[in-house]
Amino acid sequence: MLENIRDAVRKFLTGSTPYEKAVDEFIKELQKSLISSDVNVKLVFSLTAKIKERLNKEKPPSVLERKEWFISIVYDELSKLFGGDKEPNVNPTKLPFIIMLVGVQGSGKTTTAGKLAYFYKRRGYKVGLVAADVYRPAAYDQLLQLGNQIGVPVYGEPNNQNAIEIAKKGVDTFVKNKMDIIIVDTAGRHGYGEETKLLEEMKEIYEALKPDDVILVIDASIGQKAYDLASRFHQASPIGSIIITKMDGTAKGGGALSAVAATGATIKFIGTGEKIDELEIFNAKRYVSRILGMGDIESILEKVKGLEEYEKIQKKMEDVMEGKGKLTLRDVYAQIMALRKMGPLSKVLQHIPGLGVMLPTPSEDQLKLGEEKIRRWLAALNSMTYKELENPSIIDKSRMRRIAEGSGLEVEDVRELLEWYNNMNKLLKMVKRRRGSIDKLFGGKIG
């Protein structure tokens, strides 16, 4: 899936096919790639319908080309498909912190227990592993081998068939030894299709241990079948989260991820390889960036981020116009940094008042002048203290000299910035509550 979609993005952005035709071709390739990755057909067509709806309803911001804007919509909607902005919390909320792993046979649960232990050990926690999978003869030996490999102690009783008893003893032992995180590897004797028995066993061990987190381990190769298992687990264990393993070895990883995300369950980690350190905190946006080709879309995402930051500053200016608060030099700094992310000066300088480049098509000399002015202003702002940025009225002549010396500028440069800032605040008060004033002030909306 990754290669096909990545190639489609590159072809779309660099090809000479007319825009409308290129969009249709891209959407067809996206549908084909997602379905071949075992993403549910209904989810796929719902996704592409949303993309088309946004194309018809929304207008591209001026800082993005039409093709860039389209890819930013694809990025946004794909991110939602795989879980959106939901950020998993991987930090323990208390110590000791008990994690219980559950999963069917073959899901990679025991290997994941070792990876998880290594993940937390690298973060400075004292970790203990409990081998409570009594149904698979090799489970204890495997966990012991992993523990020795990463220097983490393992508690197990190879001759005891009582999983609950082993789990309780193991947890008690590690609590006495002042371990920070205790990971319990429970039985995985049931195959897919026997989820009811798996969840019943999970509840029994849960009642005995009262763990702080229950994690269901799912093999990515089951694709969209993950929906039923994840859904039932999510309903049975409100504190639970999910790890999807073997993402590197199957074409169905996208299907498993989208299926789990559709249940509302939290995907905490994904396994990206066989090595002990190949466990990655799951982030939907980062995953989608990888699908689309980070190198191809990085500049687009940077522009979108700049636009979002700019809109926050614009909202602050509207508040100032309404008499709520005052614009600070910190806001000015944030505004300039946001505009710099949005692309060439020929597109964005006209949106900053007072730079002398307010013409629709600034000349090359005007652009150079504006660019130099921005460079000087940023240097001055970077030389100011927190108090000066928040309250510019305290900047007297001696402070101006210090700022100028610290930034390699003349005092006149600092004075010019402060005069512009004061004029800006006066102008904002003058146009208070007047509809469209912010657009006049900025020479036209960016979005």
Swiss-Prot record:
Lipid biosynthesis in keyword set: no
InterPro entries according to UniProt: AAA+_ATPase, P-loop_NTPase, Signal_recog_part_SRP54_M_sf, Signal_recog_particl_SRP54_hlx, Signal_recog_particle_SRP54_M, SRP/SRP_N, SRP54, SRP54_GTPase_dom
The EC number(s) this enzyme carries: 3.6.5.4
GO cellular component, one term: signal recognition particle
Taxonomy, superkingdom: Archaea
UniProt xrefs under SUPFAM superfamilies: Domain of the SRP/SRP receptor G-proteins (SSF47364), P-loop containing nucleoside triphosphate hydrolases (SSF52540), Signal peptide-binding domain (SSF47446)
Keywords carried by this UniProt record: Cytoplasm, GTP-binding, Hydrolase, Nucleotide-binding, Ribonucleoprotein, RNA-binding, Signal recognition particle
BP GO annotations: SRP-dependent cotranslational protein targeting to membrane
EC category name: hydrolase
GO molecular function: 7S RNA binding; ATP hydrolysis activity; GTP binding; GTPase activity
SS bonds (residue pairs): none
Catalyzed reaction equations: GTP + H2O = GDP + phosphate + H(+)
Protein location: Cytoplasm
Binding site for GTP: 103-110, 185-189, 245-248
CDD domains: SRP54_G
Family listed: Belongs to the GTP-binding SRP family. SRP54 subfamily.
Record comment regarding domains: Composed of three domains: the N-terminal N domain, which is responsible for interactions with the ribosome, the central G domain, which binds GTP, and the C-terminal M domain, which binds the RNA and the signal sequence of the RNC.
Chain's role: Involved in targeting and insertion of nascent membrane proteins into the cytoplasmic membrane. Binds to the hydrophobic signal sequence of the ribosome-nascent chain (RNC) as it emerges from the ribosomes. The SRP-RNC complex is then targeted to the cytoplasmic membrane where it interacts with the SRP receptor FtsY.
Quaternary structure (record): Part of the signal recognition particle protein translocation system, which is composed of SRP and FtsY. Archaeal SRP consists of a 7S RNA molecule of 300 nucleotides and two protein subunits: SRP54 and SRP19.
Record-given protein name: Signal recognition particle 54 kDa protein
